[in-house]
Swiss-Prot record:
The lineage of its organism: Eukaryota, Viridiplantae, Streptophyta, Embryophyta, Tracheophyta. Residues 58-116 bind DNA. The gene is PTI5. This is Pathogenesis-related genes transcriptional activator PTI5. Disulfide bonds: none annotated. Its main location: nucleus.
């Protein structure tokens, strides 16, 4: 076994690959050329303290607009990869959640999502609940799919979902 001068790792003299590595290390050590620039030469001082606002998490199906809003879209495989516009959102997370909902509706459990499926399922059920809880005030109109709830002078109908 031959120890290397710069480290204490033993090398097997009978292994040709290790001997080639040993020769390369010795040659590089003999040249003593600094191959990496000094740390203070890498970045100017003002760039080191720059805030990391530019570095944001990338979400599937989400693009950032130049003016700061986030656009969400998904490709529909049933229409040969046509883009389906999902909307513009204030935050990347909202846009990613819109993408996840659409992906889950299109592809089911096989969809590649940005967030865990439990979060997507919960947001879909919350959306469904908010749509179902909308009340409609009418004047004695009856519909077989609506439940009648009496509220003061007007009749309020809530839809069953």
């Amino acid at each position: 076994m031959v120890p290397t001068p710069q480290s204490d790792l033993p090398l097997n003299e009978n292994d040709s690959q290790e001997m080639v590595l040993y020769e390369v290390l010795n040659e590089a050590n003999a040249l003593n050329i600094p191959y990496l620039p000094q740390r203070n030469q890498l970045l100017p001082r003002n760039n080191i303290l720059r805030p990391l606002q530019c570095i944001g998490k990338k979400y599937r199906g989400v693009r950032r607009r130049p003016w700061g809003k986030y656009a969400a879209e998904i490709r529909d495989s049933a229409r040969h990869g046509a883009r389906v516009w999902l909307g513009t959102f204030e935050t990347a997370e909202e846009a990613a959640l819109a993408y996840d909902r659409a992906a889950f509706r299109m592809r089911g459990a096989k969809a590649l999502l940005n967030f865990p499926s439990e979060i997507v399922n919960a947001s879909v059920s919350v959306d469904k609940l908010s749509l179902c809880s909308n009340s409609y005030t009418t004047n004695n109109n009856s519909d077989s799919s609506l439940n009648e709830v009496s509220s003061g002078t007007n009749d309020v109908f809530e839809s069953r979902c």
